[in-house]
């Protein structure tokens, strides 16, 4: 049954029942999240009004979903349609009062019983025939108001604020790159002359800007989309000379002994490459098996992500070596050492990276390597795979196995007993030069100092070294400008995809890119690239004319750049000035990891990291916040299971803050009244309130003195209280401690004391075995809430594509995958499916979701981190001229840890040794 709501010219709403027969629902698989949706529940329409305007009118409908439609509300599956397709860019928002409550008081931001507003734009002056879809649907006629310009302006402001805020919320909660939200807000803002949302314009501090420049984070592409749609694209051709390089202060290392041992593998590593050394074959097998336990991605040890690459281990797959079980059994008989080197880490779009092998028998390894590569090329002949030989200026040879689109790009070079498989010709050439002693990492004073600090004799399981020249190379004009150009190419691919979708959804007739530009869907001069590159679709993937297939671009190191545009010249000069004024030198970094086998399936992993000789001025952002090393510690309470301590320098939050010892803990005791139900959202204040712990300072109040309500005179027992936050403060002797539970503070009094510490440190963290603790259920629930939220965010994206672009639900997932170049996956390890509602509409859900109305933690759910994590100790100290980090991690391996892995961290060295 549907209900028709009629709106009279005077704004009165009345209902009329219709007899439209519902479409029977397809049988559900018994998933609790969808059980309630087998019954059609029409949304209750509370009010509606629409105001005429140009180029768009603006309307609003206030409605309420019925109980049972919680999943519809939470996933953004409420849909609004108009009989003549006149509605555009709808957005759902809380009423202003509800929004205030949601931010500060309520726990559930999307209760189906709450009153919601759906704002929308429309074209034309005739009354609107609108249908609002929940699990059921309600249809209403909305007359147009022409004579209230002030109300129109207020509606326009509310619609834009709601639209941009909704985009901000999706960006905050989602795991995926927010390209769709960025495009829509930029396009609409430009159409209507509205300000860009705060999330996109949010300024970045120096550290964030440095990180983005070095590691090509997704934020650069998001900024490129916004810039293209609001400012336009660079229209000039590259005719100007390259801007000068950044002038770095040289790193000086003195007084080194002459007898420092350097491993043979490092002799052939270029001094501008990062270097990851396993040392032995069994060490890479250990990491390989650890990776296999978590589906080929170590990040899944902490939390399942909401997306995954279309091709796992992209660069290793690109190297075109197949694997067998020989890896584990016989690899060590021919391989003496294993390493990974690279000039960058741009895995998403073509990294200059390679795998090094130090052979025990070079002739046997080389023979088998070449044989397997020939077989691979023959097997992939239909992809035009070929093997060619390249002769260098030094008359050395490099073998290249490749396909025209770069899907496979594997250079093979041999220098003595060192072998290299790499995606980059430049890395291969530098490998051969380094083996001859030209620019070898082993010959640099900084690496020798690193080996003096962390000698080869330590027999580390992993040794990672990032030299100064590695960072400097990433910040050369050649690297940065090419990185900017390829980001623009990828941005254009995504923009073109979204523009076609939106134009089709708005029934705009287009046949070419020029049509889309003229319609405002693409920026003027779209597709103009300084180097003259173009792009096209081939099958189901994008390809750049100069760089190859998206995701497998020719590495930056292999691109030749000689001329730049004026905009590029200015852009790099600004960044060079930033470093000249803020960071005059870049320091090497090194990390060492060693594992120790414990009883049964337990392992202890000890790790050390150092940032070597440094100039303190470039770390002022950190140094100014770190106080002197702590030679004492706060006595541990028996219930503490997670503890942290930090020396905090005055000035962190204000000039009045004094240097103090900050400490806190999560305790192994739960309030029996705590709400541990699964929730499909995660609010920071709610999380703090439910955390069974405390935060304190000594010998002065320090950061605990941040609220005026808590800074008053304490009562006779030392307490003050904030009614707004429901937060207690204990002032006891020289301690000031905050907690949401007064009983916890009272029990803590007897343990508050300062005792000597075994070692000085500025930061200490200690975490016990959460999986076998009393708060396991709390930690598990916290992880579930975050994962559920990320899983829902993916479906919100699909619903956004459906609503804003008019893409049918059955196509939205493939469209999202194509645009983002990732596969959207459920972060609860479920499967995304479609459910046909009683009225015939399809909606997306995950079969791992519990009921939204009355959620219960799924039986057997255990957060990924709780399956293996058994403890952590971490210390950080800055003393004299270096930062040092020391940690101990206790791990429980799975029962399959000793089995042969089917996923190969370094695809496939085993088959190299088969006859």
Model-derived segments and spans:
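Boundary at the C-terminal end of the N-terminal hydrophobic targeting segment
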Residues: 13-15
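A conserved glycine-rich beta-strand in the N-terminal activation segment of trypsin-fold
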Residues: 407-478, 482, 719-775
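Structural boundary/hinge residues at secondary-structure and domain interfaces
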Residues: 21-90, 154-156, 160-353, 357-389, ...
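A cross-kingdom feature marking solvent-exposed beta-strand/loop segments within repeated
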Residues: 325, 378-412, 439-449, 707-730
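Conserved hydrophobic/amphipathic alpha-helical signal-anchor segments
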Residues: 772-817
